[in-house]
Amino acid sequence: MSAPTVPGAGIGLDDLPLRANLRGKKPYGAPQLTVPVQLNTNENPHPPSKALVDDVAESIRAVAAELHRYPDRDAVALRADLAAYLTRQTGIAVDTANVWAANGSNEILQQLLQAFGGPGRRALGFVPSYSMHPIISEGIDTEWVEARRNADFSLDIDHAVATIAERRPDVVFVTSPNNPTGHSIPGADLARILDAAPGIVVVDEAYAEFSAQPSAIGLIDRYPAKLVVSRTMSKAFAFAGGRLGYLVAAPAVIDALLLVRLPYHLSVVTQAAARAALRHADETLASVAELAAQRDRVAAELAASGFRVVPSDANFLLFGRFADAPRAWQRYLDHGVLIRDVGIPGHLRATIGLAAENDEFLRVSRLLAADELINDESDESTGTP
């Protein structure tokens, strides 16, 4: 018996009328592997509590009888819950009208670029930073412009302001804490970027709950026509599988997104599950302090083993300097530890996990330190993200 055929398998991308600016590109692809220690995608390693699982299950059961109807198109109840959470977490009063939600923060970023980017428009980011910013920009036919960070991955605010003045981007991305380096931007520096920017400034606060830096939300009243703060429930909130991202901005920004969002984009199941997760916010976020303490412990032990560790305000560490980062990544994997090669020469990124996971990561790191690290202190190359 012949093997089953796959209809249409005889063609490839080159045979399709793909847009020219997408040819040769690669999709986002963090490895998803089953290994003993998974420290590569910056999730909260603590699973949801039984109380949260039960609440999610009951909440979904309650709405299941209405699955034949479309969900609340504007997710008003969920947005109200998010506004209440933000008001408590940041100490800044936030109203339902300031909040918008979508399927993960990547959909939030996509909607923002649909509204404020597009053909003939330009987006700028300070690299190395979150790899989805250029991918989403180019996917919406927005010109992507890179501005470099310092050799130590910090942001040179004078250079940043000068680059914005020169390139005049329609959208500026500022990630704080920055992924994959971990730096947070001080409020005074962010204000300088907002003053210089001619268009929208998106402050990506995916890891904000881990940071000691005040949220950029406090600047919205001062820059209502420019500032958008993007957040997610995938990191500190331990809700990565639930796929819920949101933003905070002036109500007019939400009105703009209503022009480009798909109707009924948030399912009734997603809305119910996210609201249940928000009811358990205090319990879930109690792990943040513990993860921050683990981060500091891991950073200190890596440094003691001879690694250079970039100071981090998030739940991950960028560290090196490896003679061959892809080879070192594979050796970690061979030992059952999955971390992330983010494409920065000489460096790898590790998520902070549970204490036992961190112990195993550190054990393997000590093994690799003997023959994988560069000893030449003069090479400060940062490469590209």
From Swiss-Prot:
EC assignment: 2.6.1.9
InterPro entries: Aminotrans_II_pyridoxalP_BS, Aminotransferase_I/II_large, HisP_aminotrans, PyrdxlP-dep_Trfase, PyrdxlP-dep_Trfase_major, PyrdxlP-dep_Trfase_small
Reported cofactor(s): pyridoxal 5'-phosphate
Single GO biological process annotation from the record: L-histidine biosynthetic process
Key words of the record: Amino-acid biosynthesis, Aminotransferase, Histidine biosynthesis, Pyridoxal phosphate, Transferase
Sites bearing N6-(pyridoxal phosphate)lysine, chain numbering: 235
Reaction equation(s) it catalyzes: L-histidinol phosphate + 2-oxoglutarate = 3-(imidazol-4-yl)-2-oxopropyl phosphate + L-glutamate
Taxonomy, superkingdom: Bacteria
Keyword Amino-acid biosynthesis in annotation: yes
One Pfam family cited in the UniProt record for this chain: Aminotran_1_2
Any GO molecular function: pyridoxal phosphate binding
Pathway named in the protein's UniProt entry: Amino-acid biosynthesis; L-histidine biosynthesis; L-histidine from 5-phospho-alpha-D-ribose 1-diphosphate: step 7/9
Quaternary structure note: Homodimer.
Similarity comment text for this entry: Belongs to the class-II pyridoxal-phosphate-dependent aminotransferase family. Histidinol-phosphate aminotransferase subfamily.
Name of the protein in its database record: Histidinol-phosphate aminotransferase
